[in-house]
Regions:
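Charged, helix-prone or intrinsically disordered regulatory segments positioned adjacent to compact structured domains
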Residues: 26-48
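Long, low-complexity, intrinsically disordered terminal regions
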Residues: 41-195
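Long, low-complexity intrinsically disordered regions enriched in small/polar
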Residues: 1-34
Length: 195
């Protein structure tokens, strides 16, 4: 059985030996809602100016030390401004988690999985390199790109979800950056400094 036989109900080939036109019907594609879209939408409806200073947010490690340890430059201001948006992210994640138990853990796990995919890609690239480096050195030399890749993967999830279509671009970008900033603080993106 040829390939055209297997798909004969979904496509037709029309043309001569020199020119072939392929008409193919795309399978039904149904978008699904994404929990992370809900977080970004709720963040977009809040004023971020009324937040507590970062000194009121507790951390189990020094954020500046983590920024230095991972050599973060481009996204450093986003992380340093965590106090301006961190409480809102925490409140919204908590609210969504109360509405659907386990949501916060799933969202942070998704972000951590995206981070691990980036690390896996870097390991693959590094394995082909003449100069073999420790993975932390690879992470350090690519930390800003890793953060950017995680941001872009989340934006893709939201853009492809059924509940992420009606957001303003600015709300989408800022919301995703705030969530990734939170994930950095929660050690779901980049490495915790060795003590």
């Amino acid at each position: 059985m040829g390939q055209t036989d297997m798909c004969s109900d979904r496509s037709t080939n029309i043309g001569t030996a020199q020119t072939v036109h392929i008409n193919q019907v795309a399978p039904n594609f149904q978008r699904r809602p994404a929990l992370i879209s809900q977080v970004v939408k709720r963040l977009s409806s809040l004023s971020l100016l009324d937040e507590a200073p970062s000194s009121l947010l507790e951390h189990t490690y020094n954020i500046d030390a983590k920024l230095e340890y991972n050599h973060v430059f481009k996204y450093r201001p986003l992380i340093e401004e965590y106090g301006e948006y961190g409480n809102n992210v925490i409140k919204i994640l908590s609210t969504i988690d109360q509405e659907k138990i386990g949501s916060e853990r799933k969202i942070l796990k998704l972000i951590n999985d995206f981070y691990k995919e980036c690390i896996g890609n870097l390991r693959r690239i590094e394995s082909c390199s003449e100069k073999k480096r420790e993975i932390i050195e690879v992470i350090r030399s690519n930390s800003d790109q890793i953060i950017e890749d995680v941001i872009n993967k989340i934006i893709d999830v939201i853009n492809n979800s059924s509940n992420g279509q009606d957001m303003d671009e600015e709300d989408l970008i800022f919301g995703v950056k705030y969530i990734v900033g939170h994930a950095f603080i929660e050690c779901k993106v980049l490495e915790r400094p060795q003590l």
